[in-house]
Amino acid sequence: MGKKDGKRQLMSDDDSFDTISILSGSMDQLSVGSMEDSGILKGSKTWLEELESTIDDLIEVKKIGAKEREEHLEKIYVICTRHYAKRISENVASLEELLLKIFNGPRSDKELILTIRIMCTFCLASVFQVEELWTKTEGRFNALANDAESSGIKCESILCFSLLTALLDSEADVIEFGDFLISILESDGAVVNSEDDEGVVGCACQALGLLLTCVTTESEFLASAAEALSEQLDAASIDVQLAAGQALAALFERVNEIRPDKDEENDESDVSQTSKFDDIIPDRNQLLITLRDLASESSKSIGKKQRKVLHQVFRNVLQTIEEPNARNILRNSVRIGQSTVQLDSWKKILRAQMLRYVLGSSFSEYFAKSTFIRYFLGYSGYVAGLSSRDPDSDFDSDNVDEYIDDHKRGLSSTERRDLDRVRDKQKKQDQRVRADYINSVYFSQN
């Protein structure tokens, strides 16, 4: 695992794999408005007028050069990563059709990446329907992940399709794409003709971690994922190690929630905690040794900043795997508006990372205004300080008095985690009821 693609700039320094870069700083202070300095807005146009005008130009101009098309796409994406771009009522069907045409055709890397990002962003803004877009793009995304010549395109396809799959919330599809990602890890990228490409392998770890947050039932997929991720802890790349470690922590977190304690009176004992994961990680002791080494890595070849990130992340990963029932391991939070958003689980952290990757500086605005985004991150409160009259917001104005800080709702991190567990159980029950209904209809007709 030593090859680096020097031409690929998959993420900026602020969007790297580690938890710290995404959660540090003041996400609530990120600019989500002014674009005059970047030359995006012209004259007296508002951002929405400029967005609609650019979309119209892209749709209506039949003969447009690749360079001009790239400029239009870049302008659309820049606006969408500074504002909650939900109010595009006209030309939605035409825009989706055009983006799919660009996506499926032979394009430059930049044009293709911009198109992928825009499609994901409009799904997050509920402009496009996730299920429809996922169905229309599945084949192409898989082809790009397997056969694209550019590592950047492979990485983009892996990350963005994993996000669409997570948003789709279909466990069968999650496992199917997850198995593909596992094959990438097991072969160090060779299965997609990217052997020892740390970018591709790192993205596969990151994407697999995201998909693991969607798993709600027992399957062999969990053990296969754990084995593949454990092997990547020995990778030469710190980014790969971090992505693999966080994904492993998310896996243990999910297993701990899926499997009820065999003996609740003794659920704090080392014996019960260990036996609970025996079939997932047969050699758990060796895994813990590896994690302790990473949590205290002192090699001079690693920069001071990287070493700090490595230590902090792997201390949390180690505690999650060593003491699955421990409380308050993760104490990350971000400030959005006047609300404190607790990211106190690996599920929330990995999902926030992927949203931050696609949405950039508009993450906080999308979170504040979109119930869909807040639900995806497991946030049950409202965002204080947001005007109920904002036309972009999907809040019910009748509940304006309930825009309160989640931290003040009286829920401890333990209570929030228990609430998530109840929701997962209800989700599984709903899936069973739906499956039973479909089977009853099918068999009644045959």
Swiss-Prot record:
The keyword Phosphoprotein applies. Belongs to the IFRD family. Signal peptide: none annotated. This is Uncharacterized protein C20F10.03. Keywords: Cytoplasm, Phosphoprotein. Residues 411-431 are annotated as: Disordered. One of its GO terms (cellular component) is cytosol. It comes from Schizosaccharomyces pombe (strain 972 / ATCC 24843) (Fission yeast).
